[in-house]
């Protein structure tokens, strides 16, 4: 796996699924391929994206700044600086300075990532802030190691939270989670269906599923009534894709 592929993988792991994630993936690919060289326009686009947390925007802004060649005097962006200040906690800043001194001695991506993983997310963000604000310099490879360590920590906590939700025994949360998944699956089906005649059936199924979820939420239903809803939808989607000659390996 190349370095840039690894960076893209880690960064995308902290972006919530949805159309925006696909857009960000495309932007990252373009940047890494040297196709997008307008850093200012890229940062303006990033700043106005909805849904993303300030820290995720800060990390993406840091990655874009590291990768896109820019004029020396280009202004640093406030939204990135604010996201990478470790919540203004002096403790984070002290640790960030210690980490920075260690990173200065590293020359490889993996070495830097290994060192960084033993620090808290706040300290890692502050250290990125130091580098972003030109208070310190490290090689691009080392900076990417720092980015990936931060993303790994964030993804770990997101995974833990997700696992807790999936394994919860609370029937109301499970019920709502199944309805949300069914609704987003239906939306994906509608987007993938396109406008061909064969798509009409898939569109109909998706539309019915969304109406059903809406009705279930409106009138309030027994928590077990949503069981199997998403799986039924996926079966329909796979059948439709088979007819269209599209092989879908795994969607669940």
Swiss-Prot record:
GO molecular function: RNA binding; structural constituent of virion
Keywords of this entry: Host nucleus, Membrane, RNA-binding, Viral matrix protein, Virion
Gene Ontology biological-process annotations: viral budding from plasma membrane
SMART domains noted in UniProt: Flu_M1_C
Membrane topology category: Peripheral membrane protein
Pfam families named among the record's database cross-references: Flu_M1 (PF00598), Flu_M1_C (PF08289)
Region (RNP-binding): 165-252
Keyword RNA-binding: yes
Coarse class of the protein's main subcellular location: virion
Span(s) of short sequence motif Nuclear localization signal: 101-105
GO cellular component, one term: host cell nucleus
Function noted in UniProt: Plays critical roles in virus replication, from virus entry and uncoating to assembly and budding of the virus particle. M1 binding to ribonucleocapsids (RNPs) in nucleus seems to inhibit viral transcription. Interaction of viral NEP with M1-RNP is thought to promote nuclear export of the complex, which is targeted to the virion assembly site at the apical plasma membrane in polarized epithelial cells. Interactions with NA and HA may bring M1, a non-raft-associated protein, into lipid rafts. Forms a continuous shell on the inner side of the lipid bilayer in virion, where it binds the RNP.
Subunit details: Homodimer and homomultimer. Interacts with NEP. Binds ribonucleocapsid by both interacting with genomic RNA and NP protein. May interact with HA and NA. Cannot bind NP without genomic RNA.
Miscellaneous notes: Most abundant protein in virion. When expressed alone can form virus-like particles in transfected cells.
Protein name: Matrix protein 1
Organism of derivation: Influenza A virus (strain A/Equine/Jillin/1/1989 H3N8)
């Amino acid at each position: 796996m190349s370095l840039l592929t690894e960076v893209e993988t880690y960064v995308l792991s902290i972006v919530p699924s949805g159309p925006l994630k696909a857009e960000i993936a495309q932007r990252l690919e373009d940047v890494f391929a040297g196709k997008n060289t307008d850093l200012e326009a890229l940062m303006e686009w990033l700043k106005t994206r909805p849904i993303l947390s300030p820290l995720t925007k800060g990390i993406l802004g840091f990655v874009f700044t590291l990768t896109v060649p820019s004029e020396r005097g280009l202004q640093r962006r406030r939204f990135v600086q604010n996201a990478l200040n470790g919540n203004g906690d002096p403790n984070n800043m002290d640790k960030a300075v210690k980490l920075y001194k260690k990173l200065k001695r590293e020359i490889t991506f993996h070495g830097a990532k290994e060192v960084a993983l033993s620090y808290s997310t706040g300290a890692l963000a502050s250290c990125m802030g130091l580098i972003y604000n030109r208070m310190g310099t490290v090689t691009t490879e080392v900076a990417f190691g720092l980015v990936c360590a931060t993303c790994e920590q964030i993804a770990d906590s997101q995974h833990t939270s997700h696992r807790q939700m999936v394994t919860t025994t609370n029937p109301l949360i499970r019920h709502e989670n199944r309805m949300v998944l069914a609704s987003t699956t239906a939306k994906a089906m509608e987007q993938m269906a396109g406008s061909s005649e064969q798509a009409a059936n898939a569109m109909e199924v998706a539309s019915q599923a969304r109406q059903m979820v809406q009705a279930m939420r409106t009138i309030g239903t027994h928590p077990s009534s949503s069981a199997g809803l998403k799986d039924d939808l996926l079966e329909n989607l796979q059948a439709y894709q088979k007819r269209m000659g599209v092989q879908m390996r795994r969607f669940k």
